[in-house]
Amino acid sequence: MAERTLVGLALKVGPLGEHDRLLSLLSDAEGVTRLAVPGARRPKSSLAAAAPLTLLELQVGGRSGLARVRQLRVLHSHAGLGRQLETLSAAQAFCDLCLQIGREDPVEGLLATLQLHLERLDQRSDCLDELLASSVQGAIHLLTLGGYSLPLQSCCLSGAPLEPPIGTWEWRCSLLPMDGFAIDRQPGAAMTLNPSELALLQRLTRADLPRRRDGELMGPRPVWLRLLAVVEIWIRTHLQRGNPALAMLRECVTAKQVSQHGADAANS
């Protein structure tokens, strides 16, 4: 295999034998590539910087089998996301998604989109609701790039436009996991959404989070948890397995919500 230079983000790093590491790298050139990093588990190895959530420039080669990293340079690290379990869970969820959707062939824009959403997680780490919303939106953007977009524009049964009538609170649409969203309550639905929930979900395909005129995030935390559930169901159905990191994020947010309610009750 020819010597080459790769620039990409470390999605996953695990042990390989006694002294080496196995690196899963996302790059524009090759999509997801598995590489051996020789000696990276040794304390003073020059290749020990091959860590998850790190943007790397690698010199790679090898005559046959698993390609090996010859040299390594760290271009940027998202290690700060590990300071909180919530941001770490969201970042891990993004990486796991990229491992699934970028494995076959390179996906144009996937690396840049992943880095953008990792930066947003870091910027919004101080506000739990913003972090949760960014996690839902980031997952939707990555799914769309990978060809697994949520069909949010038309009813999967009738083909009629999905136009949520804001203010008509008895209206519902149903999530049919294999097919998409259908108007009205439908048998076999995994969950139903009201008009404001669907409208909020539809806006997540845009570049920025939905905000009110005063700049505040639209939607309360329980609604964002419901939209997270939509994403979890879609991933589990169409990628053949769930995303444990998203489940961990849900647990973290729910636990903080319960803790906050307890504190509010004690102070009242």
From Swiss-Prot:
**InterPro entries from the entry?**
ARFGAP/RecO, DNA_rep/recomb_RecO_N, NA-bd_OB-fold, RecO
Q: Give any single GO term for biological process.
A: DNA recombination
Give a yes or no for keyword Acetylation in this entry.
no
Extract the Pfam families matched here. Answer: RecO_C (PF02565), RecO_N (PF11967)
- Keyword set, alphabetical order: DNA damage, DNA recombination, DNA repair
Give the SUPFAM superfamilies listed for this entry: ArfGap/RecO-like zinc finger, Nucleic acid-binding proteins
Entry GO CC: bacterial nucleoid
- Output this protein's name: DNA repair protein RecO
Source taxon at top rank: Bacteria
State the species of origin. Answer: Parasynechococcus marenigrum (strain WH8102)
Describe the function of this protein: Involved in DNA repair and RecF pathway recombination.
Entry keyword annotation includes DNA repair: yes
Q: What is the lineage of its organism?
A: Bacteria, Bacillati, Cyanobacteriota, Cyanophyceae, Synechococcales
- What HAMAP family does this protein's entry cite? RecO
Q: Which family does it belong to?
A: Belongs to the RecO family.
